[in-house]
Amino acid sequence: MKLSISNIAWSKENDDKVYEFMRELGYSGLEIAPTRIFEEQPYQKLREASKFRTNLKENIGLSISSMQSLWYGRKEEIFGSVSERKALLEYTKQAIDFARELECRNLVFGCPKNRNTHSKEDFEIGIEFFGELADYAVSKDTVIGFEANPVIYGTNYMNDTLSVIELIEAVNRPGLMLNLDLGTMIYNKEDASILCGKADLINHVLSLIHI
């Protein structure tokens, strides 16, 4: 089992201390929020991202296992206007390009405040939206890991693990997989048996609820 920790768990000034602690404990991965590394326009800093990845690997022995908080600071909604959706598509493709420079194989899609649904037709819109992103992710050697967010996150879209599995199977592309959040399963009182026969859909496992 490979272990990683998210860098939103501590402040930036403690990075070096925590990295060393992780190495001592045998951790091999670091999950990052891009704006924790580059505060402004992180996805425009591809060269810097590549350098960060190299330094982290060569000096600490850590790889970037995952990215979270992909849409931090964005106000657009998937199921808002067409222009909002297009803006989010392009922004997410930039995030995927950024992930490629980091050799990161999982982009956590949570973004609860940007994904509230308003009608039954939104499910089909979601299939098209995430299908396009899944295709782009595969072309860049990475994966969108869709995370169920319970209602306490303030969203009404994909609140439980089974709903996300249904979406992934509907999209049916290798670039969209399940980011399994154990905190969500515990909150929803989901039985682990729902994952029987679905292991091939899981790309990443979380033991904490993201905020």
Q: Locations of the language-model features?
A:
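Structural detector of well-ordered beta-strand residues that form the stable sheet scaffold
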Residues: 4, 65, 107-108, 145, ...
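A generic structural signal for short coil/turn motifs at secondary-structure boundaries
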Residues: 40-42, 117-119, 152-155
